Curated annotation (Swiss-Prot):
One of its GO terms (molecular function) is snoRNA binding. One of its GO terms (cellular component) is ribonucleoprotein complex. It comes from the Archaea. NCBIfam families: PRK13130.1 (NF009623). It comes from Thermococcus sibiricus (strain DSM 12597 / MM 739). GO terms for biological process: pseudouridine synthesis; rRNA processing. Belongs to the NOP10 family. Involved in ribosome biogenesis; more specifically in 18S rRNA pseudouridylation and in cleavage of pre-rRNA. It holds the Pfam family Nop10p. Keywords: Ribonucleoprotein, Ribosome biogenesis, rRNA processing. This is Ribosome biogenesis protein Nop10.
């Protein structure tokens, strides 16, 4: 079963459409991806998050 409900990242409106009816922004899936214990991209995702937040990054 595919998820159909989407959420606008700009205004937070939930919809079934590809674009937000209120602001016209492209919507994204409202559900997180499935959890996998063998997360193949976990290391990269955590590294990106640390870099984005500036944690443990040498400047």
């Amino acid at each position: 079963m595919r998820f159909k409900i989407k959420k606008c990242p700009k205004c937070g409106e939930y919809t079934l459409k590809e674009t937000c009816p209120l602001c016209g922004e492209k919507t994204k899936l409202a559900h997180p991806p499935k959890f996998s214990p063998e997360d193949p991209y976990g290391e990269y995702r955590r590294r990106l998050k640390k870099e984005t937040l500036g944690i443990g990054v040498k400047k």
